[in-house]
């Protein structure tokens, strides 16, 4: 039973990466090698499955953040989160839509917020960001990335996201680097 759940989440991660979060869930069940009934027994709706995929991504971000250099933690996290957004267009928008209606989403969102708060506090402590920059400002960057992904040609989306990040980080950081760090997070599965 637990094994089916893990297979479904891994399949959803892969299918969302290939086709976006709005893909028919039949494709997820097929990729996982389970029937629709099994998928819906574990995940009663799309939002519950999206929440599980999001939790895997936040788990991976937390582990990755523990290995990042403290002096550039915020920049690395922003780049990684944007790369995750580009990796599965629509997933973060779906997570926001599920907030408050899907069990577990609020807790995963809280963990993601804590991760950003810690990174931002460290950046403020080191004088790496402009005074007054808040977690809401950083979240606005991710909303802009979602906007870029929604309108950009998929073939150019990653390059456009990198450019958007460069522009916005130059606005947030006190002494922005000449180049952004490269994404390095590898998701399980």
Name what the model sees in each region:
Residues 52, 62-88, 100-104, 113-114, ...:
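Hydrophobic alpha-helical connector segments
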Residues 1-31, 48:
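Basic, helix-initiating cap at the start of DNA-binding domains
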Residues 16, 24-25, 46, 50-57, ...:
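Amphipathic alpha-helical segments enriched in hydrophobic/aromatic and basic residues
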Residues 114, 118-125, 151-189:
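C-terminal peripheral helix-coil segments that are non-catalytic and often amphipathic
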Residues 104-108, 125-140, 152, 156-160:
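All-alpha amphipathic helical-bundle segments outside canonical DNA-binding/catalytic cores
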Residues 33-43:
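Short hydrophobic/aromatic patch on the recognition helix
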Residues 93-102, 183-186:
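Short linear capping/connector segments at secondary-structure termini
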Residues 71-96, 106-107, 118, 131, ...:
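Helical hydrophobic small-molecule/effector-binding pocket
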């Amino acid at each position: 039973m637990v094994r089916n759940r893990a297979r479904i989440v891994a399949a959803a991660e892969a299918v969302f990466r290939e086709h976006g979060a709005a893909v028919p869930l039949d494709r997820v069940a097929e990729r996982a090698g389970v029937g629709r009934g099994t998928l819906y027994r574990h995940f009663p709706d799309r939002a519950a499955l999206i929440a599980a995929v999001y939790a895997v991504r936040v788990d991976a971000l937390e582990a990755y953040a523990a290995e990042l250099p403290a002096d550039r933690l915020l920049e690395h996290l922003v780049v990684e989160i944007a790369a995750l957004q580009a990796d599965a267009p629509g997933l973060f928008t779906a997570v926001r839509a599920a907030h408050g209606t899907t069990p577990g989403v609020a807790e995963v969102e809280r963990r993601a917020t804590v991760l950003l708060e810690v990174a931002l506090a460290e950046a403020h402590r080191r004088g790496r960001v402009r005074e007054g920059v808040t977690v809401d400002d950083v979240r606005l960057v991710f909303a802009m990335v979602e906007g870029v992904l929604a309108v950009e040609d998929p073939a150019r989306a990653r390059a456009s996201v990198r450019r958007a990040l460069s522009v916005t980080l130059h606005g947030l950081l006190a002494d922005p680097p000449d180049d952004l760090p490269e994404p390095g997070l590898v998701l399980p599965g």
